[in-house]
């Protein structure tokens, strides 16, 4: 387990418990279970205390944890018959974006998501989840396909933001993000988005302009990273804690503001401590949201989605 900086006291306690058990395995007849169990209880109590009231900055740290389940994990666990589509039919295939046809609970769907990678090699291959223009254009292809065949769209958002490189800008990064956002508003099928980690800026909005937006309990969604905000406003990236507070980027704040429709509970200690339980909770939330659409027709879906976003900001700002 990789520990975050605020989890260091927890790391020490869990480390001591593991050391005791390792000693018992090496030395036959040594009984340490009572001592180890006491340390386990102490660690569980501390974990509960640490996660009872996380600050926005600490939630950012949890949302970025490298061991949280990623898009690939959710697709493998929740979807069957997944058939990926590649390329934007124009320039290249962007590996930061996964997407294809699949079945969810036997319902044919299109699933699209950001994939950050799980080790050095795959993180480089996936560009750390930062999509280039061809990634957003691939997503538009998939949404067009879903619209044509009347398939619900499910997006899984986990990105620090769209890739800001020179080549991406030359190939029309801002236009590609805008087209993807526009396509979200145009398709006449149910569109569900789940923020599973980071929801960074326009790179996230391009997939999250949905009928229903769900966020994992410790995920974040913001126009800019706390570090970027602090650098611009205070010329000091070290003020990221103050920036995180001001940005109102947590799932709980965004639910109060009406941006987030559903907050999905995570296992104690975050999704990284129990991936299977976190994935199961997301699956149940998606199933519930899909069932809520009933027999809504194309015109109703498009009108309702547009109204939802036009109404943002009209309520909840005083919360």
Swiss-Prot record:
What task does this protein carry out? Component of the acetyl coenzyme A carboxylase (ACC) complex. First, biotin carboxylase catalyzes the carboxylation of biotin on its carrier protein (BCCP) and then the CO(2) group is transferred by the carboxyltransferase to acetyl-CoA to form malonyl-CoA.
Could you tell me which PROSITE patterns the record lists for this protein?
COA_CT_CTER
Q: In which pathway does it act?
A: Lipid metabolism; malonyl-CoA biosynthesis; malonyl-CoA from acetyl-CoA: step 1/1
Query: Could you tell me the Gene Ontology terms of the biological process aspect for this record?
Result: fatty acid biosynthetic process; malonyl-CoA biosynthetic process
Protein name per Swiss-Prot or TrEMBL? Acetyl-coenzyme A carboxylase carboxyl transferase subunit alpha
Residues covered by the CoA carboxyltransferase C-terminal domain: 38-292
Reaction equation(s) it catalyzes: N(6)-carboxybiotinyl-L-lysyl-[protein] + acetyl-CoA = N(6)-biotinyl-L-lysyl-[protein] + malonyl-CoA
EC no. given is 2.1.3.15
Q: Gene3D superfamilies per the record?
A: 2-enoyl-CoA Hydratase, Chain A, domain 1
- Sequence similarity: Belongs to the AccA family.
Q: Which UniProt keywords apply?
A: ATP-binding, Cytoplasm, Fatty acid biosynthesis, Fatty acid metabolism, Lipid biosynthesis, Lipid metabolism, Nucleotide-binding, Transferase
* Subunit structure as annotated in this protein's UniProt entry: Acetyl-CoA carboxylase is a heterohexamer composed of biotin carboxyl carrier protein (AccB), biotin carboxylase (AccC) and two subunits each of ACCase subunit alpha (AccA) and ACCase subunit beta (AccD).
Which GO MF terms are attached to this record?
Answer: acetyl-CoA carboxylase activity; ATP binding; carboxyl- or carbamoyltransferase activity
The first-level EC class reads transferase
A cellular component term (GO) from this record? acetyl-CoA carboxylase complex
| Highest taxon above the source species | Bacteria
Compartments where found: Cytoplasm
Q: What is its main location?
A: cytoplasm
Name the species this protein comes from.
Jannaschia sp. (strain CCS1)
